[in-house]
Amino acid sequence: MRDDYNKMEKKVSDVKSILIAPSWQKDNIVDSCLDELLDNLKGHGYKITVRPHPQHVRHMPERMQQLKDRFANDDDIEIQTDFSSNSTVFEADMMITDWSGICYEYAYTTCKPVLFIDTPMKVMNPEYEKIGVEPINIWMRDSIGASLKPDEMDRIPEVVDQILKHTEDYKQKIDEFVHEYVYNLGNSAQVGADYIINAVVRKINDKKNKESK
């Protein structure tokens, strides 16, 4: 994916673009603080694209229309509910999300920073702390960007400004993070395919050996 991104023609613009890409879980950005976030971020010279989770669009069309109506007169805000293209994802200068996995795809591919809103985390294993290892999706947040609490939306303009002023620093930091924690970078498909083929061949050979005895 990185290779494909690096080959893409990059659009040059004097206007910094911000992508807001929430997750689909309880108390996500859309359901908790999106209106306040947009109210604080608009009017600062950015192009802001809100790309809700597809499930939000499917199950809460009234909420999507409410957002479109509320910000209809704000030329710097787009509520995007057409997912036929992912160009807005990779063209954005930074992303704002909560716990969505899209942050990995975005940051690891583009080496661009992410601002995380610390909405309640979706916990699949309520006893995860007994393992004694902090999940990567918690501690990596400040490694590839910055974090704010939902009740700190008044700080959005200053934090976004600081992040965008230090994109080169984040680029280097994220690239180092990816090379340290992502294995088989750039050739994982080949490694995965080789593993599957070798596993199948071993099974076949084991079966033949058992039958020949």
Label each residue range with its predicted role.
Residues 101-180:
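Catalytic binding pocket for nucleotide-activated donors in carbohydrate/polymer assembly enzymes
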Residues 11, 66-73, 135-143:
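Short, conserved catalytic or adaptor-binding loops enriched in Gly and charged residues
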Residues 185-213:
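C-terminal alpha-helical cap of glycosyltransferases
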Residues 3-7, 34-36, 80-84, 102, ...:
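A generic local structural motif
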Residues 49, 78, 94-96, 115, ...:
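Hydrophobic/aromatic beta-strand patches that form the interior of the parallel beta-sheet core
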Residues 1-67, 150-153, 164, 184, ...:
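Conserved catalytic-core segment of nucleotide-activated headgroup transferases in glycan assembly
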Residues 60-104, 109:
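Donor nucleotide-activated moiety binding/catalytic core segment of transferases
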